[in-house]
Amino acid sequence: EELTKTRKNFSIIGEEIGELKNSDKENYWIIDPIDGTTNFLHGIPHFAICIAQMSNKEIISGLIFDPIKDEMFFAEKEKGAFLNNQRLRVSNKGLLDECLFSSNREGVKFSNLNMRCSGCAALDLAYVASGRLDGFFHNRINLWDVAAGALMVIEAGGIVNNINKFSHNNINIKAS
């Protein structure tokens, strides 16, 4: 509701509402009010609020807020990625056995990697951007789960495969 006050003509893509097209079809808010809903519902303190802005089919800004840790991750295209105003950088570990990855494990064939599945893709991507995690692999995920975090990884010096921003779901993503 607050976002529509500042940019009332923007269209919206969100987990709760699907796609809501307004008069401006080139600019979108991409919203996930609670990424990690299952964690939240079970009292597991690992979930986030996610908002991204897409303009002309390109993610140009993103925000991931962890209300439990009071951590605000944000990124703006060509301006960097930050955590509470501190610049973020991806890790630079050279040995795979020293790395920690997050994945839903679906279709991942790297059994020798240190893997975790946290249940909150947005925070996992923010953690890749901040160097807490070294990589992220996920199949069949939704755009609202990864839009803000994918930009963060790129702005923190990382690499994200070319995700299809025209699809709202069934996205396969790799980031490091």
Predicted regions span which residues?
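An extended, acidic
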Residues: 89-176
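Residue-level signal for inorganic ion chemistry
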Residues: 3, 12, 37, 66, ...
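Short, isolated positions in well-ordered beta-strands
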Residues: 60, 87-90
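DPxDG-like acidic metal-binding loop motif
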Residues: 23-82
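Acidic active-site catalytic centers that drive phospho-/nucleotidyl reactions
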Residues: 15-16, 32-35, 39, 124, ...
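Conserved residues at the C-terminal ends of beta-strands
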Residues: 15, 65, 139
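N-terminal subdomain of lithium-sensitive/metallo-dependent phosphomonoesterases centered on the IMPase/IPPase/PAP
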Residues: 1-34
